[in-house]
Amino acid sequence: MFCCLGYEWLSGGCTTWHSAWVINTLADHRHRGTDFGGSPWLLIITVFLRSYKFAISLCTSYLCVSFLKTIFPSQNGHDGSTDVQQRARRSNRRRQEGIKIVLEDIFTLWRQVETKVRAKIRKMKVTTKVNRHDKINGKRKTAKEHLRKLSMKEREHREEERQVSEAEENGKLDMKEIHTYMEMFQRAQALRRRAEDYYRCKITPSARKPLCNRVRMAAVEHRHSSGLPYWPYLTAETLKNRMGHQPPPPTQQHSIIDNSLSLKTPSECVLYPLPPSADDNLKTPPECLLTPLPPSALPSADDNLKTPAECLLYPLPPSADDNLKTPPECLLTPLPPSAPPSADDNLKTPPECVCSLPFHPQRMIISRN
């Protein structure tokens, strides 16, 4: 071929019948049968094409099988794959299941959000309608104000419930405390009653006689009329010791003349002076306990007492609240004979010399001890 080209170049590019003959003869001599190069080349090309088709078919079938395996995974664990591949498949399957669960959760949340948004849109539409209606009537409110009012009402209701519950708890605690104090007071009252009963049983029978009360009434009347303090030793026990020796009764009679009352005390009913005892703190001469006192201060405007200087024991003038109906001739009258004395009563008091005073609810203190 190159020879032909060189021959053409050497010949100056002119083609003649001679040159064509030379080429044809060379071709016939070198390549018998065809111009392509002969049968060996055809055989090689044919074999190569057949092998290429086979390789292409093998590759295509392998790819198809791989694709089918990917689409339809085998349920059999012993499919000839290695452990690494099986673990990878399992992890992929779990991952796919996890992705599916996550997608379901996402869709659920999306539905919830969509529901809330739709409800809010519906509320906004209703609020818009209400606002349009109220705008005509001169009113206007928004969804925020409505929600704020609802929240305030809920808070107020919750606060009221809390206050009621707290008040109930405080009331229960107060009632419990009151019940405790009542129990303590009742126990103290019971102890006081027991103590009173115990000491009342220890009092001597002579102190429980009516004479003791009469003597105490006389002492109270003496204290009220004279202004001296009341001495608790004027009891039956002290009077018993003092009544043993008495001076003779005085002959002088004291007559008290007042604008509204005139008293004439008989000689047998005069209160005799008592001798001093061991527990007497008064420094009184034994000849007479009823002695005139020094002149006192000027009486006030509301003082109706007219106290003579010669004697302190005298009846008071009747007051506005005095309901006693006492005969004016004598307030100190002898008492009727008392009960016979008991075995432990050593008082020897004649019945005509016991001081009897009129009963007055504001001037008499009866001791029950």
Curated annotation (Swiss-Prot):
Xref: InterPro entries: NPIP, NPIP_N
A Pfam family matched in the record: NPIP
Region annotation (Disordered) ranges: 151-171
Family: Belongs to the NPIP family.
Entry protein name: Nuclear pore complex-interacting protein family member A7
Organism this protein belongs to: Homo sapiens
Gene designation per UniProt: NPIPA7
